[in-house]
């Protein structure tokens, strides 16, 4: 089963075009840093290592995601085999049978988060096993620290993994809440274990804090302020989240859990740590879903533990039935993927996002049409810039306001260097040339087509940086760099270019 799913992911990693987010992370690896605009740096570090070893091919960049289910499965086995080798094996098998572990080969910020979260939980599970054995055998006795001497290394290792998860994505905070709930409600006498975990995770937190202090607090401005300004409660979002979780966990698993709900409840009480890490983050996402659409990939860092809970609670004679149901569920997905694989690009021309498909699949041809010697290529959005830049093998800056997502160019691109040059700004939609005229001596519209899809480029001659700074960068500052007065800003390269200070007046 592991080899079959691995083969499927390898095939998809080579067959699927690069997405905008993946291309963005590729550029993170090209401009290596210890932090990036949207998120902490781990996926950029991973891709930098992959590039050094295997090069820039799409399949190589996706290799961490391709291997991810094997790493998570190993963590599950290592953590719960001491409880029951057969049940741990069932947990790994059920997890591996889920369609997401056959069909997901995309590299995202969640990829390292999922791995490090799984190993953080595995290490604390082992720590608790050792600690409870130490207490039971009177090594130090109840209330003494003999258990900490016996299990301290595992608690520390869990903290290190939590730190690595923190440097992957801030959603690890939900795992932190789950662990805190466990120690508060079920393991209060071993609270020093939690303290040791926190201490070992703190260096990663300090590293990220320093990066934010010296890089405009972009992680905080993006994740806390800019992306949530217009959030309003909607029951539809809650319903979408519930439906997504029903699909992800699968009707098969949920039906089995309902049929054996008494066993689920008893197992949840006996395995309190597992219950907390499996359920608390998903419940917290449920609470957030009223004001925020929860992405499917967001929950995958906590999703594996649901299958451990299922494997431990179901009667042994019911596990083969669960396996058969999941095989059928998986087969439906594989047949759908096989059917899609038989189609060609023109057959999708009536799909709403056909333009994005063309851009992803034909990026090299688009670049070839627009590129001319002596002209700088840009785009009006991060997704297009990242994908087309990957195809061109040169960084393609974003021109204009862009969106609140992925504003990495604010930190690394100095538009002053393009003063006096001719630019071509590639766009998916037909532009209004009046929006570009203030920044050039002259502008003209160039029209192209690729696989029946029109796209455009605005050619501007003799770029005027001062006008761009006053017209575009000042508005970007007003929208995305309104730091709260209480937030200390040590350095901000964007503001330094705009006004010569760490923060600029809006």
PLM segments and residue spans:
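Short helix- or helix-capping micro-motifs
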Residues: 2, 88-98, 162, 166
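Specific aromatic-rich, kink-prone transmembrane helix
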Residues: 30, 73-75, 94, 112-133, ...
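Membrane-interface alpha helices of multi-pass inner-membrane proteins
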Residues: 31, 151-169, 180-181, 285
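Transmembrane-helix motifs of polytopic, lipid-linked glycan transferases
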Residues: 63-85, 119, 123
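Membrane-interface transmembrane helices that cradle and orient dolichyl/undecaprenyl
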Residues: 81-86, 120-157, 263
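Short acidic/glycine- and proline-prone juxtamembrane loop motifs at membrane-interface regions
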Residues: 105-113
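Transmembrane-lumen/periplasm boundary regions of multi-pass, lipid-linked membrane glycan transferases
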Residues: 164, 175-269, 277, 282, ...
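Membrane-proximal, lumen/periplasm-facing interface regions of secretory-pathway glyco-
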Residues: 296, 322-373, 382-406, 425-504
């Amino acid at each position: 089963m592991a080899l079959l799913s691995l083969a499927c992911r390898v095939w998809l990693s080579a067959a699927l075009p690069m997405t905008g987010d993946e291309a963005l992370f590729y550029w993170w690896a090209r401009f290596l840093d210890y932090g990036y605009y949207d998120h902490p740096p781990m996926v950029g570090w991973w891709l930098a290592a992959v590039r050094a070893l295997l090069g820039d091919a799409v399949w190589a960049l996706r290799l961490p995601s391709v291997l991810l289910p094997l790493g998570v499965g190993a963590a599950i086995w290592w953590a719960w085999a001491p409880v029951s080798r057969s049940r741990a094996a069932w947990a790994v098998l059920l997890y591996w049978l889920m369609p997401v572990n056959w069909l997901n080969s995309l590299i995202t910020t969640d990829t390292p988060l999922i791995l490090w979260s799984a190993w953080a939980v595995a290490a604390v599970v082992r720590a608790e096993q050792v600690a409870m054995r130490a207490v039971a055998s009177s090594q130090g006795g109840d209330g003494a620290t003999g258990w900490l001497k016996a299990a301290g290394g595992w608690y520390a290792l869990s903290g290190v993994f939590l730190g690595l998860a923190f440097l992957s994505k801030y959603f690890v905070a939900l795992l932190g809440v789950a662990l805190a709930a466990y120690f508060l409600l079920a393991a209060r006498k071993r609270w020093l274990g939690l303290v040791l975990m926190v201490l070992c995770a703190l260096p990663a937190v300090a590293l990220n804090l320093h990066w934010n202090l010296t890089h405009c607090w972009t992680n905080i401005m993006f994740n806390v302020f800019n992306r949530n300004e217009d959030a309003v409660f909607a029951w539809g979002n809650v319903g979408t989240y519930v439906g997504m979780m029903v699909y992800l966990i699968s009707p098969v698993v949920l039906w089995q859990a309902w049929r054996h709900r008494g066993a689920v409840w008893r197992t949840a009480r006996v395995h309190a740590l597992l219950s907390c890490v499996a359920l608390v983050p998903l419940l917290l996402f449920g609470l957030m879903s009223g004001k925020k659409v929860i992405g499917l990939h967001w929950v995958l860092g906590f999703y594996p533990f649901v299958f451990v809970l299922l494997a431990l609670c179901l009667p042994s004679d019911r596990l083969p039935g669960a396996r058969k149901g999941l095989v059928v569920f998986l087969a439906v997905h594989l047949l759908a993927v096989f059917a899609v694989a038989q189609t060609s690009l023109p057959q999708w021309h009536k799909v709403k996002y056909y333009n994005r498909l063309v851009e992803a699949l034909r990026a090299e041809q688009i670049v070839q049409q627009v590129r001319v010697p002596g002209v700088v290529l840009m785009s009006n959005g991060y997704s297009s810039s990242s994908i087309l830049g990957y195809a061109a093998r040169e960084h393609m800056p974003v021109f204009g306001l862009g969106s609140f997502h992925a504003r990495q160019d604010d930190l690394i691109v100095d538009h002053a260097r393009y003063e006096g040059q001719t630019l071509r700004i590639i766009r998916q939609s037909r532009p209004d040339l009046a929006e570009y005229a203030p920044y050039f001596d002259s502008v003209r519209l160039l029209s192209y087509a690729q696989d029946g899809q029109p796209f455009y480029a605005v050619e501007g001659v003799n770029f005027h940086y001062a006008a761009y700074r006053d017209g575009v960068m000042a508005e970007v500052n007003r929208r995305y760099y309104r730091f709260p007065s209480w937030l200390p800003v040590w350095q901000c390269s964007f503001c330094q270019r705009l006004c010569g200070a760490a923060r600029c007046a809006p």
